[in-house]
Amino acid sequence: MFLTLIAAIISFMVSAFTMPYFIKFYQLKKIGGQQMHEDVKQHLAKAGTPTMGGTVFLLVATAVSLLVSLFSIKNTQSLALISGILSIVVIYGIIGFLDDFLKIFKQINEGLTAKQKLALQLVGGLMFYFLHVSPSGISSINVFGYQLPLGIFYLFFVLFWVVGFSNAVNLTDGIDGLASISVVISLVTYGVIAYVQSQFDVLLLIGAMIGALLGFFCFNHKPAKVFMGDVGSLALGAMLAAISIALRQEWTLLIIGIVYVLETSSVMLQVSYFKYTKKKYGEGRRIFRMTPFHHHLELGGLSGKGKKWSEWQVDAFLWGVGSLASLLVLAILYVF
């Protein structure tokens, strides 16, 4: 526990100290910044804001985790666990970095195509499974203490879980501070679970990432001076999925990650309903004002027809939802 606290403090200090230099370098080199949705007019002023800040907090958290773990790793099993989680973080961070690089440096608006990104994510998921999950012998999902055997189909579950939540966190990263603190809330919850399970190596990784993210948030809260980019969001989503697998609490991510599930579901519902109504009525209709869901809240509150919400209001609401969901999981696991 002490080493976890040390890792969190070091990560926070290094991340908070380094980020201004990253922002300044970005601005001095006149690198193109984040592009904004024209439909949300209050976001247009953010055009050109430095992005790819996730590069900094990922490097910091990874380096600190490895450094501090040298004093705590006692066996090869712990080393395999840490390397497994860090490997998926690094792999998905590289995928996100490539996507951001193409958008910003090569001026390719869409970055990687959807098919290219999915292919790389699947390759990363396969590497994670065959190098770290399969050797551990895990082939079942723990649901409320009951082991649901999947056999070889656990491979497909891992791919779905990692790819799905990496993209879900990516969709959540749409307004200042939303994704960073939402992930912190999720990580704190998994930190409690790891502590109860005496999984102190996982707890150390969680502490390092929480510290690095809080250092990043010092510059990502409204008005944001930097965004995490795909390099950060894809890696964070994959990390949450990997941690839920490592702790054998996969099902909890559906509740702990309710914000990411809500954001992703809103997009899927919107697209499906639009296509259905266009085919049936000749014109597409929408359920939400705009998706992902945080934009719907911005444009008209919960109903979509009320007063516009500020980014702080949206943040507070979704952080609150995530916090309550996390408390519910802890209550289910350790109270009821």
From Swiss-Prot:
Ranges annotated as spanning the membrane: 3-23, 53-73, 78-98, 118-138, 143-163, 174-194, 200-220, 226-246, 251-271, 316-336
Gene Ontology cellular component terms for the protein in this record: plasma membrane
Record keywords, A-Z: Cell cycle, Cell division, Cell membrane, Cell shape, Cell wall biogenesis/degradation, Magnesium, Membrane, Metal-binding, Peptidoglycan synthesis, Transferase, Transmembrane, Transmembrane helix
GO BP annotation list: cell division; cell wall organization; peptidoglycan biosynthetic process; regulation of cell shape
Location relative to the cell: Cell membrane
One GO MF term attached to the UniProt entry: phospho-N-acetylmuramoyl-pentapeptide-transferase activity
Membrane-topology descriptor: Multi-pass membrane protein
Superkingdom to which the source organism belongs: Bacteria
Main localization category: membrane
Cofactors demanded by this protein: Mg(2+)
Pathway(s) where this gene product acts: Cell wall biogenesis; peptidoglycan biosynthesis
Similarity annotation: Belongs to the glycosyltransferase 4 family. MraY subfamily.
Biological function: Catalyzes the initial step of the lipid cycle reactions in the biosynthesis of the cell wall peptidoglycan: transfers peptidoglycan precursor phospho-MurNAc-pentapeptide from UDP-MurNAc-pentapeptide onto the lipid carrier undecaprenyl phosphate, yielding undecaprenyl-pyrophosphoryl-MurNAc-pentapeptide, known as lipid I.
Protein name per Swiss-Prot or TrEMBL: Phospho-N-acetylmuramoyl-pentapeptide-transferase
Gene from which the chain derives: mraY
